[in-house]
């Protein structure tokens, strides 16, 4: 089976639309976050069924909860594996600036969340790296190491020096 579009996302559906999928069995395509940025890929569901994903250019990244296929009694949904991340919570704007600058020099991929997010504080989230953890420990910057399903995958930012 070739999937060429995402039909919707379970996390975005209004409650009354979600009810239409209630009786369906959910077959999962379990993907690590890094695979979400690939438009063309082969995947195997948790039932051992192979599928091809061939999304149109510009269609956006896959996300946790994306509905790939719906049949009579079954649906195929993307399930994203948690990513090992460092959740960095600087105490001051100065500490944030110094930390972001130091980590930015490493061309580290990061995401930023405000206090209204699921983190409950303004934080910077980056993929786990032992050298970053060592820097944070030595600099005294508060952080925690967590396993998280991120709303969007880390993506390399193009640049030149």
Swiss-Prot record:
SMART domains: UreE_N (SM00988). Belongs to the UreE family. Keywords: Chaperone, Cytoplasm, Nickel. The keyword Glycoprotein does not apply. This is Urease accessory protein UreE. NCBIfam families: PRK13261.2-3. InterPro entries: UreE (IPR012406), UreE_N (IPR004029), UreE_N_sf (IPR036118). The gene is ureE. It is found in: Cytoplasm. It comes from Pseudarthrobacter chlorophenolicus (strain ATCC 700700 / DSM 12829 / CIP 107037 / JCM 12360 / KCTC 9906 / NCIMB 13794 / A6).
